[in-house]
């Protein structure tokens, strides 16, 4: 559905770009049948979620304007905190056992102005979408947009030291073939 919002077209997802070097149809179909004005409002709302300082996914934004991401955070409640649990001091999702915590959701597309990718992230028992799912979506989206490891300046300044450490750790465990650009699969 996110790809449909991004393009205002009926989109059938495809997992394979080409077979034996022959590119397969893109999956983009007929117009969705929703007015451009309504789609523009939804897209703008998703852009604000990620790129406005008050947006729930602002901390997971992509810095480069030409690669700006639009998205929507979400939380799927697994169960209510009961009155008895509240009486025992359980007041937050984090206070519950892992298997009872809410699921974190985030959907996104990018670049905002000329969408090429759409994705959905679900982190089971991850809590809120902005804290658990949106950062994963941003990292996956950056990998897709850059065709590999993105530069640190693609990330918000406050995250760059942590991201640099994570990238260095990943380089240590990557298979040699992946480093040489060869696919292991």
Where does each model-flagged region fall?
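Active-site beta-strand/loop architecture of penicillin-binding DD-peptidases
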Residues: 2-31, 37, 46, 50-151
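Gram-negative outer-membrane assembly/targeting C-terminal domains
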Residues: 145-185
């Amino acid at each position: 559905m996110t790809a449909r919002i991004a393009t205002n077209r009926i989109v059938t997802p495809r997992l394979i770009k080409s077979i034996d070097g022959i590119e397969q149809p893109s999956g983009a179909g007929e117009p969705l049948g929703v007015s451009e004005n309504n789609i523009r409002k939804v897209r703008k709302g998703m852009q604000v979620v990620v790129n406005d300082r008050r947006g729930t996914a602002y901390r997971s934004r992509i810095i480069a304007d030409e690669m700006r991401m639009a998205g929507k955070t979400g939380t799927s409640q697994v169960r209510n905190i009961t009155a008895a649990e509240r009486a025992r001091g359980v007041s937050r999702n984090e206070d519950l056992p892992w298997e009872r915590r809410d699921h974190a959701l985030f959907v996104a597309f990018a670049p905002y102005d000329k969408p090429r990718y759409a994705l959905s992230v679900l982190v089971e028992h991850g809590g809120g979408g902005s804290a658990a799912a949106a950062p994963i979506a941003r990292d996956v989206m950056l990998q897709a947009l850059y065709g590999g490891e993105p530069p640190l300046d693609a990330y918000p300044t406050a995250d760059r030291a942590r991201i640099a450490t994570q990238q260095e750790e990943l380089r240590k465990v990557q298979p040699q073939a992946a480093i040489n650009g060869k696919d292991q699969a």
